[in-house]
A protein has these predicted regions:
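Peripheral terminal and linker regions in Fe-S/redox and tRNA-modifying enzymes
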Residues: 1-330
Length: 330
């Protein structure tokens, strides 16, 4: 009897997706179709898009009295590390929700912006206009490092909060996917043509490899007196240590997550536990090492138990800490 573990189907989809391309570009050009195939819909999450069934439209009927059936629309989520967004970008999102969406703009509990009710034919223009404001939807969803959160206020004349934001920005930059799929599929050149969509040219993906992470990975940065991001509910929480008015390091908490599947007794909520104390200049490398440990050892056979909290529960803190140190080369 084989001991080989059967992987979840999503793992094969990612592995054979040409670094998150799939056949998204060709399906995007298909006329008469308002949705993507199931495999591509899964890949689209990494691009910040969720394909959704418009349930209200199910009630509508054709001229002959027959029901129209399923009608699809999309949610578009913008990734904004630390939640800092310019007035220009915010106003652009308000404009987009009126022009292409259902008229609503949602500010998420994880410092992102969401447009709803976008139809397939308007996706590319929506993403292109978000990009013009120097923001992106790439990595806002999917099996990657999600939006890195940070307590934003006060915005000015506060060196500690400035350092927190710098840490959040640095982690977000370090852990962003390197694939060029997003640029090639969604962004256009000056003539309005999508770039290089016919030929797959792989790039080095040093952190995520071919299959990215087993599931999403969430990070938050905050202070003891202002835990506005609720960092103990994340895979990784960095709690700032302030001495003599300056930020000197972080207490590292890992393994948080409140998600539960009611029908699966094996799932459970968890509060993050302290793993270590690190210096400010060590925060990024420790974050990367933890993500790499999760990449290599997380559960890829069952997505219900594929978060870091389950790996921590299985291993225990000492083994987890020791493995992270190995990845750091210590």
């Amino acid at each position: 009897m084989s001991d080989e573990v059967k992987l979840d189907k999503s793992e094969s989809v990612k592995q054979h997706s040409d670094q998150l391309r799939g056949t998204i570009a060709s399906e995007l050009c298909e006329s008469g179709s308002d949705h993507f195939t199931k495999d591509n819909a899964g890949l689209l999450k990494h691009h910040g898009l969720y394909q959704q069934d418009n349930r209200d439209a199910r009630k509508l009927k054709n001229e002959d009295g027959t029901r129209r059936g399923k009608s699809f629309m999309f949610m578009v989520r913008t990734r904004i590390p630390g939640g800092r967004v310019s007035a220009e970008s915010f106003l652009a999102h308000l404009d987009l929700c009126e022009r292409f969406g259902n008229g609503t703009l949602r500010i998420t509990s994880r410092q992102g912006l969401q447009l709803h009710g976008i139809v397939k034919d308007d996706l590319q223009q929506t993403i292109r206009e978000i990009s013009r404001t120097r923001l992106t939807t790439f990595g806002a969803c999917g099996d990657v490092e999600r939006n890195v959160m940070c307590c934003p206020a006060p915005l000015r004349h506060d060196a500690v909060h400035d350092q927190l934001q710098q840490t959040a920005d640095a982690i977000a930059e370090e852990l962003r996917p390197r694939t060029t799929a997003y640029t090639e599929i969604w962004l256009q050149d000056d003539e309005g043509n999508r770039e290089n969509v016919t030929e797959f040219v792989p790039v080095d993906e040093p952190i995520y490899g071919a299959t990215y992470l087993p599931r999403k990975f969430k990070t938050g940065v905050s202070l003891p007196e202002d835990n506005c991001v609720d960092l103990l509910t994340y895979d990784l929480g960095l709690l700032g240590i302030v001495e003599d008015g300056g930020l000197v390091g972080y207490n590292v908490f890992i393994g948080g997550g409140q998600g539960v599947t009611p029908s699966a007794a094996k799932t459970f909520p968890a509060i993050a536990r302290k793993m270590a104390r690190v210096g400010v200049d060590e925060a990024v490398e420790v974050s990367r090492a933890l993500v790499e440990v999760f990449r290599d050892h997380g559960n890829r056979s069952d997505r219900k138990t594929a978060r870091l909290k389950y790996l921590l529960a299985d291993w225990g803190m000492e083994r987890m800490k020791g493995t992270v140190e190995e990845y750091l080369g210590r």
